[in-house]
Amino acid sequence: MSSGRVLVLALVLSACLFCGCISTDRPASSKEPGNVNVVATTVPLGHFTEMVGGDRVTVAVLVPPGTNLHTFEPSPSKLAEVEDADLYVKNGAGLEIWMERIIQANEEMLVVDSSSGVDLIESTDADDHGHGAHDFHEDILTTDPHIWLSPKNAIIIVDNICRGLTEVDPENAEFYQKNRDHYLSRLRELDGELNSTFSETDRKEFIVLHPSWSYFARDYGLVQVPILESEKEPGPRYLAEIVEVACEKRITTIFVDPNFNPKSAEIIAEEIDGRVVPLDPLAEDYIENMRIVGREIASSLDG
């Protein structure tokens, strides 16, 4: 065989390998050629991954927007999304109780625990997350999984994601690190803004339907007062206590998570002649959303 024909054959074989015509240990991926295929548990984690990965990553989110994180179960179609992933970004902190099923769907992908290095909050089953004064509940320690709702934690999470991308795609390490550094500077700026905002508020207590904001409260010296008891609708005694706290602390705003039934919040708001305001913990544009959250909570403390 001539050297020319050998060269042509080699080029054809190389092209087949690149296009997936020759099977490898991993199934063919539908991702953009050359991209790192990433699946993230939540919309914010997917957003962080895109901020670091830029056009070098293709990101899918496992838990769809508008879904209750605490009741979500991955369907077969969702598990199929994981099969081609190079990297899975999990929330950690006990959120993904179904994580073993994710790993079984793709044992070769790298799993990044975004909670690694975060100072986790342990709380009672009453969901007071260290910020309430309700001692009549059964004390069962759990871990608060809402770690991303703290700009300080977000800095740690973004760095964890960058490490994961660098491990699976070392050739683009400098690209990921540059994007990470740029986004971290924006997160630090956000943290500074929020520190300044809440240092000027005299009152610190705010009432929420679902206790998503424990880490946010810890960051800025606030006191979160939750309505829901362990994902269950509260009884009359607990509702009466919340109303008493609201009157004592001059609270007139009840913050609700759009993914939860607002009925209890509306009852309390009516009792205190207050208002119900939504705060979305899963909004896609993290920095803009946290600025909105900061403005709304600060406004409620000044009212």
What are these regions (language model features)?
Residues 1-31:
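Secretory targeting signatures
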Residues 21-303:
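Extracytoplasmic metal-acquisition and chelation regions
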